[in-house]
Amino acid sequence: MTPAATATATATTAADASDLTATDPLGDPSSHRVLTGDRPTGPLHLGHYFGTLRNRVRLQDQGVEMFVLVADYQVITDRDIADRLAEHTENLVLDYLAAGLDPERATIFAHSAVPALNQLLLPFLSLVSVAELSRNPTVKDEIAHSSQAAVNGLMFTYPVHQAADILFCKADLVPVGQDQLPHLEVARTVARRFNERYPHADGRAVFPRPRALLSDAPMLPGTDGGKMSKSRGNAVALGADEDTTARIIRGAKTDADRRITYDPSARPEVSGLVLLAALCQERDPEAVAEEIGDGGAAALKRTVIESVNEHFRPLRARRAELATDRGHLRQVLRDGAERANAIADATLAEVREVMGAI
């Protein structure tokens, strides 16, 4: 990283040399602290499961200390869902638990329940310039896709808020995709600049330099061949029943070629379905395509429906059972907030001390 006005310039660069991939050895897993999470904008779908949820559970089971954030404050950057925010938050926790996250081993909490985390945003904002924020490609992209006539301040400072998310618990690893590296670079820059400006009296740094844990999961497209999205109607929700799953997959786009092959560039719709079946079967997508062969779109969709419903049957059963006790979901959030608040309060106290605040 360059020292001056480049918090977002690294958006055009590859991952840092110290970053890790999901298959890299972690050494002592218990020595690592991971921050990850989601915005509660709606139900999680199969893309979330194969892209992030599976890996979170794997890290948890290895003994990594996990912090899983329900980013409810970040939802209001670009939408007003006040009438559904509590429901979406509970359903997100429901998906987490059904997928295998264990609240005894993972701290699951909501932004709005941890005041000290959000208070870190103020000193952190003093460490980045307006020009740096305006160059952040993720912010630019979200602004371009926003329906708002004017961008609000919360959206504009979104990367710094994410830096506070990461640094409040002093996370040293952050699972991200390549497209999220610019946000992580902001957190790295904030940490470095804060440590340079406000070191401890003995020279110790307050914050670690967080590293990326780059996902090796293939991008699972939606049923229309485009990006899988909760808002585009091209995704199967984790909690969907088997009939709904079948209906959505039967309506997926394919092409006129009867021979089923796996070619994501030339045949994105067909290849997306093949990949979904392969992920559920834990097989190579080329082998799945070869097995279907000349069966055509109907055989492909049957295979996908059977594969998805079989793979997710245990998860969906757990989800249905957990859904009968909404009070437990709220208790998970309260317990997580208690742990997160203790850590955030200690971090804020340390920040105020090195800054010389009374």
What residue spans do the PLM features occupy?
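Short helix-capping/linker segments at secondary-structure and domain boundaries
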Residues: V64, V130-S134, F168-P175, A278-V288, ...
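A generic structural motif
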Residues: P40, V174-P175, N234
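A generic secondary-structure signal for well-formed alpha-helical elements
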Residues: V93, G100, V128-E132, A171, ...
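Structured ligand/cofactor/substrate-binding pocket environments in proteins
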Residues: L44-G51, L59, E65-A71, I81-H88, ...
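Conserved nucleotide- and phosphate/pyrophosphate-binding catalytic cores
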Residues: T6-T10, R188-I358
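Generic detector of short, locally flexible boundary/turn motifs and exposed helical patches
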Residues: S31-L35, Y73, L133-R135, L181-L184, ...
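Short amphipathic alpha-helical segments, especially helix-boundary/capping motifs
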Residues: P29-R33, Y49, M66-D72, L97-A99, ...
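N-terminal Rossmann-like or analogous alpha/beta NTP/dinucleotide-binding catalytic cores
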Residues: T2-A164, A320
